[in-house]
Amino acid sequence: MPVVSAFYAALTALLCVVLSSLVISQRFGKAISLGDGGDPTMSRAMRVFGNFAEYAALVIVLLALAEILGVSRTWLHIYGAAFVLGRISHAIGLYRTPKPNLFRASGVTLTLAVLVGLAIALLLATLRKIG
């Protein structure tokens, strides 16, 4: 049972709700029903959510596959926690300002590190099973 990945999937789902709520509140507050209405804050809220969505499903699938293939729980927690923290950091950085900043940079760095780490872990686990 992939319980560790289920835990991070649940945290990711909650983060998804928070980020989509930011978009919804901007829409209501600015009476924008579709698109960004030319509003930079609305545009940033949409990109924060969109950027999150672009990575979330892939990371959760990779995490679940890693767990199924027997990657250690310690590493699964490291990858899962780093992903969630990275996405929170990126969201804070991008929502605050469109300019490059430490939150945004550290968020994308953590996210990409998790993707690379999980890819390597999956390759190694797969090679152990095949070989």
Language-model segments: residues:
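Interfacial loop-to-transmembrane junctions
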Residues: 89-116
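Juxtamembrane boundary at the C-terminal end of a transmembrane helix
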Residues: 120-131
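Mid-chain, well-packed structural core segment of small domains
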Residues: 59, 66-96
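Core segments of transmembrane alpha-helices
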Residues: 50-63, 115
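N-terminal signal-anchor transmembrane alpha helix
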Residues: 2-30
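Cytosolic, membrane-interface loops and tails of multi-pass inner-membrane proteins
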Residues: 21-47
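Physicochemical signature of membrane-embedded alpha-helices that form the seven-helix bundle of GPCRs
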Residues: 8-11, 46-50, 79-82, 107-110
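Juxtamembrane loop-transmembrane helix junctions in multi-pass integral membrane proteins
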Residues: 3, 41, 45-48, 71-74, ...
